[in-house]
Swiss-Prot record:
Belongs to the polypeptide deformylase family. Binds 1 Fe(2+) ion. It comes from Maricaulis maris (strain MCS10) (Caulobacter maris). The lineage of its organism: Bacteria, Pseudomonadati, Pseudomonadota, Alphaproteobacteria, Maricaulales. Fe cation binds at C94, H136, H140. This is Peptide deformylase.
Length: 174
């Protein structure tokens, strides 16, 4: 397993639409393992393959709390349907938009179909934080970031903030 670089805004790769996966094989499982390791190293709860520069429809997630045992989840070619009419606001953040958080409204319940780590077909109802996280990560697969839901001014400020943080990191590393 390897920790991969997480792309940050304004990297244009993050705006690409991810492509479906043909099959779940050892190469894909290696990608998912790397993604999970990368997500854990960055203290995240979800990561889409496009965030590590791989435009495939793959998501990893772990919503276990810091005091709980890890509960990794893998979603290959996920499809969302039947969102609830009830929207709930949640404060969201993103590993590709570090240090930026804002409230986003999303359906609080949604149906999801996907292939798991072993290529098995699965479906379930996502609710609460799981629903928020899967919708957030699904947006990545469509080239959408959570800041795209914000006003133009807030979005511009977010990108500037990330650029400043990244520049500071680069300066510190030099």
């Amino acid at each position: 397993m390897a920790i991969r670089e997480i792309l940050t805004v304004p990297d244009p790769i993050l705006k690409e639409v991810s492509q479906p996966v043909d099959q779940v094989d050892d190469d894909l499982r290696e990608l998912m393992d790397d993604m999970l390791q990368t997500m854990y190293a960055a203290d995240g709860i979800g990561l889409a393959a496009i965030q590590v520069g791989v435009p495939k429809r793959v998501i990893v997630m772990d919503l276990a709390g810091s005091d709980e045992e890890a509960k990794p989840r893998y979603f290959v070619n996920p499809v969302l349907s039947d969102p609830s009419d009830t929207l709930k606001p949640y404060e969201e953040g993103c590993l590709s938009v570090p240090t930026v958080y804002d409230e986003i409204e999303r359906p609080d319940r949604i149906h999801i179909q996907y292939l798991d780590y072993d290529g098995n077909e699965c479906e379930e109802i996502a609710e609460g934080m799981f629903a928020v996280c899967i919708q957030h990560e699904m947006d990545h697969l469509e080239g959408v970031l959570f800041i795209d839901y914000l006003s133009r001014l807030k979005r511009q400020r977010a990108v500037q903030k990330v650029k400043k943080v990244e520049k500071s990191k680069d300066r510190d590393a030099a």
